[in-house]
Amino acid sequence: MSLDDALSSLKRGEFVLLHDSSGRENEIDMVVAAEFVTPEHIARMRQHAGGLICLAINSSLGKELGLNYMHDILSSSAHFDSKSRGMIMGLAPYGDHPTFSISINHYQTYTGITDRDRALTIREMANL
């Protein structure tokens, strides 16, 4: 699939499989444009992707919303011994700190766990 084909698929709300790099994590991510996410997309990712369901946002939106990286949140905690702090402050095998943040839920969700709740949160984040 060419880059143009992948972009067209994303614009239609279809999944694109994205391989990050054999020199990094060497994994394939299922990617779909947030504005099109449905509960069916979430179910498919949950059942077939085998990992976290993540929403990528740009850093300026994250800062505006006060969404700090989990690494920064944990590293500022005084409740870790030196072994735990070493694990938190360490780098991933690909050379960076993990860039995950905290879990978020839209205010109209119930638990945030269901496919419907997750899809709603992701779609609404696309509107920001």
Model-predicted segments: where are they?
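Catalytic domains of riboflavin
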Residues: 1-128
